[in-house]
């Protein structure tokens, strides 16, 4: 009996060992954790638990690998879309090729322009402006009884007669244009500036020395070189202020 029981127990152990070995062989790809669980399990119930554990771990590992692959694929798609967007042309409406080339050429031409040319152009402009200022000779003109004075360019005139006509247009012409005023049935002609003062008005000028002189006492060239300002005065008030008034 003892021999039979010993042989029975030995056969049971051998069967259990075979089960453990077969479980270990079938679950060898799973890893160290599954091997540890198999070595601690005994019997068919332990074998079933071992297979269930192996199935769960394999399913979780496969799901994690799938999720990781999907994340990597999504990142690649996002990077590809960003690269395609950066390569697209921005702006609407689109610019034609020849227009774009012309714009580029214009930008290059403006960048390569000689700065000395711009400087010379500015210098020439300043010189022309200064020449115009020298060619023009403005003097102030006032008239007794009129608070507002005016300026006149003497270089625009060549003689005393032209100057007198311009001053008459400025100060003595009627406000209604060139028409004469009618008073008591008589036509009133505009007042003129006469050198002899017979019209009641005389044109005087102040020279560089500050003396008041009668316009027309010297040649036109000397007058242009010495005049500082002009004044239309009444003959009665001009006595004693101009040295050569008649």
From Swiss-Prot:
The protein's matches in InterPro entries, at most eight in alphabetical order, are given as:
AUX/IAA_dom (IPR033389), AUX_IAA (IPR003311), PB1-like (IPR053793)
Q: Where is the PB1 domain?
A: 136-235
Q: Identify one Pfam family in the record.
A: AUX_IAA
Q: Does the keyword Methyltransferase apply?
A: no
Q: Which UniProt keywords apply?
A: Auxin signaling pathway, Nucleus, Repressor, Transcription, Transcription regulation
Found in which tissues?
Preferentially expressed in stems and flowers.
Which GO cellular component terms, listed alphabetically, does the Swiss-Prot or TrEMBL entry include?
nucleus
Motif range (EAR-like (transcriptional repression))? 36-40
Q: Report the subcellular localization.
A: Nucleus
Q: What induces it?
A: By auxin.
Which GO biological process categories is it annotated with?
auxin-activated signaling pathway; regulation of DNA-templated transcription
Which protein family is named in the record? Belongs to the Aux/IAA family.
Subunit (UniProt): Homodimers and heterodimers. Interacts with TPL.
Query: Matching PANTHER family, A to Z?
Result: AUXIN-RESPONSIVE PROTEIN IAA11 (PTHR31734:SF6), AUXIN-RESPONSIVE PROTEIN IAA17 (PTHR31734)
Q: What is known of its domains?
A: The N-terminal half of the protein contains two conserved domains I and II. Domain I includes a slightly degenerated ERF-associated amphiphilic repression (EAR) motif which seems to be involved in the activity of transcriptional repression. Domain II is required for the correct degradation of the protein through the SCF-mediated ubiquitin-proteasome pathway. Interactions between Aux/IAA proteins and auxin response factors (ARFs) occur through their C-terminal dimerization domains III and IV.
Q: What does this protein do?
A: Aux/IAA proteins are short-lived transcriptional factors that function as repressors of early auxin response genes at low auxin concentrations. Repression is thought to result from the interaction with auxin response factors (ARFs), proteins that bind to the auxin-responsive promoter element (AuxRE). Formation of heterodimers with ARF proteins may alter their ability to modulate early auxin response genes expression.
- Give the protein name, as stated in the record: Auxin-responsive protein IAA11
Q: Which organism is it from?
A: Arabidopsis thaliana
């Amino acid at each position: 009996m003892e021999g039979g029981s010993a042989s029975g127990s030995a056969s049971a152990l051998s069967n259990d060992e075979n089960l453990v070995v077969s479980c270990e062989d079938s679950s060898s790809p799973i890893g160290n954790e599954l091997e540890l669980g198999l070595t601690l399990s005994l019997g068919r119930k332990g074998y079933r638990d071992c297979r269930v554990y192996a199935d769960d771990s394999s399913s979780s590992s496969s799901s994690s690998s799938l999720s990781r692959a999907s994340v990597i694929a999504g990142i690649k798609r996002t990077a590809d879309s960003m690269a395609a967007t950066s390569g697209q042309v921005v702006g609407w409406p689109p610019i034609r090729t020849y227009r774009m080339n012309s714009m580029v050429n214009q930008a290059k031409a403006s960048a390569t322009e000689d700065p000395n040319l711009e400087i010379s152009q500015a210098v020439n402009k300043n010189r022309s402006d200064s020449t115009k200022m020298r060619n023009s000779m403005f003097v102030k003109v006032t008239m007794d009884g009129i608070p507002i004075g005016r300026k006149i360019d003497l270089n625009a005139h060549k003689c005393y007669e032209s100057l007198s006509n311009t001053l008459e247009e400025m100060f003595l012409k009627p406000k209604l244009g060139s028409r004469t005023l009618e008073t008591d049935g008589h036509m009133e002609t505009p007042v003129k500036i006469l050198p002899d003062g017979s019209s009641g008005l005389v044109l005087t000028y102040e020279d560089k020395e500050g003396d008041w002189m009668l316009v027309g006492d010297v040649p036109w060239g000397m007058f242009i070189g010495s005049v500082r300002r002009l004044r239309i005065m009444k003959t009665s008030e001009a006595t004693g202020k101009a040295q050569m008034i008649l």
